[in-house]
């Protein structure tokens, strides 16, 4: 008998495709004068957010553009500055990407009805 089910909510049962963080990362970089592509933004998906930003800042094209725009290679202060734009942007748009995937709500309700515990990551 199944006793528990663990759901990975963000990007799996809601916001399938992780569009909210992708949009927030792209807007945070654009705010600092360095537009990034969706492909560049998606490459480090799954990392902690600051590590994601740091990884993007070390990508060859982004690093060169950052240096051209800001006159220096990206520093930890720059990671903090991009993150400071990213986090509030993400929270301001989450509701636009919060619709559950088809059958996610029904599945959770059925599991509860069956007495199966539900956890999340």
Please tell me what each predicted stretch does.
Residues 119-121:
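Mobile, glycine-rich extracellular loop/lid and propeptide segments
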Residues 2-117:
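N-terminal helical cap/lid subdomain that shapes the substrate entry/recognition surface
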């Amino acid at each position: 008998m199944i006793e528990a089910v663990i759901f990975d909510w963000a990007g799996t049962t809601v916001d399938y495709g992780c569009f909210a963080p992708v949009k927030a990362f792209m807007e945070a970089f654009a705010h600092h004068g360095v537009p990034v592509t969706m492909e560049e933004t998606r490459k480090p998906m799954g990392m902690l957010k600051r590590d994601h930003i740091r990884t993007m800042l070390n990508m060859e094209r982004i690093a060169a553009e950052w240096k051209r725009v800001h006159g220096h290679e990206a520093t930890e202060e720059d990671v903090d500055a991009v993150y400071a734009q990213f986090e509030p942007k993400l929270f301001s748009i989450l509701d636009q990407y919060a619709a559950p995937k088809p059958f996610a709500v029904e599945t959770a309700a059925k599991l509860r009805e069956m007495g199966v515990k539900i956890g999340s990551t």
